[in-house]
Amino acid sequence: MATSRATVVPMKMTQMKAAQVPNPGADFQIVECEIPRPDAGHVRIKVQACGVCHSDVLTKEGLWPGIQYPRVPGHEVAGIVDELGAGVSEWKKGQRVGVGWHGGHDNTCRECRRGDFRNCRNQKIAGISYDGGYQHYMVAPVEALVAIPESLSDVDAAPLLCAGITTYNALRHSGAFPGDLVAVQGIGGLGHLGIQFANKFGYKVAAIGRGSENAALAKKLGASVYIDSTSTTATAAEALQKLGGARVILATAPSSKAMSALIDGLGPNGKLMVIGATFDPIEVTPVQLISGSRTIQGWAAGTPADSQDTLRFAELTGVRPMIETYPLERAAEAYARMMSGKAQFRVVLTM
């Protein structure tokens, strides 16, 4: 993987700056470019904050097919409507809006016609299909927009538009009921939000982390129980079984080995809900699934309507991301911090 240095590329006198990836695996470039104009059905957003998500590696390293370069990453965008394209009437200039992973859909494929916009065959993704939020201004289709509640700051709202919606949406579609034992694997960028949401949903939350030093934070975030996966006394799966077996395990840390080791911690009809993305296979035997009618399901983000639900729920319950902020000009440093796994816990660019 290329190192994350940024070079400044001078261009003609223009009006905004952007942090772009010129080619797959290349260093970030801070460039000057013209402020884009919105086409019909689009709006221009004056970006106030943009989260730096692990999924940005797809753009940075060219791991998503069909990306056209240079490309500006960023799909956790919070800003203000700056200009309306032709035919846009449902949004107003000056309105606070956000754009998440779901950057648009075609409305014509089988999934869209059935209302399953999350699985649109031709889904657009901000920062992949078109330039994202690592810049002062960006253009997005109206179907990608979500209104940001006034009580949420831009830096708090931005991570909720990907990390937040992913954990919130996965949990509310997991089949768990209030009072059920729900385990959250990992206390990081996704996990620290998953613990908060699970607590507010009324679940009995077991947080699974590495090392006893994470116990206090897990309890502060809302966990009833902390399980140290490095303990030599009992495995995490055994610890869950002593609690009766988990109805749901929300797997947030991208470690297939760790996920595989937790399957035996599921109770009857238990579900391993996977949101931590990795290309390595999860190892499971048919007997593990058949015994107790266990299932494994993946979940990816959601629609702007789901984002709206996430923001409203966070507004009402006080769920907030823990963040570190960097100015746009330090995008390379912010990205490297995120990739190091040492950030506490979401990294956000500010404009």
Identify what each model region corresponds to.
Residues 2-14, 200, 260, 304-351:
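C-terminal hydrophobic helical "lid"/dimerization subdomain
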Residues 203, 253-325, 351:
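Glycine-rich phosphate-binding loop and adjacent beta-alpha segment
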Residues 181-187, 199-261:
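Adenosine-nucleotide cofactor-binding segment
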Residues 34-50, 63-110, 144-152:
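Glycine-rich beta-strand-centered segment in the early N-terminal region that forms part
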Residues 166, 190, 214:
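Hydrophobic/small residue at the entry helix of a nucleotide-binding pocket
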Residues 1-78, 140, 350:
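Short N-terminal strand-loop motif that marks the start
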Residues 104-185, 220:
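NAD(P)H dinucleotide-binding glycine-rich loop of Rossmann-like/cofactor-binding domains
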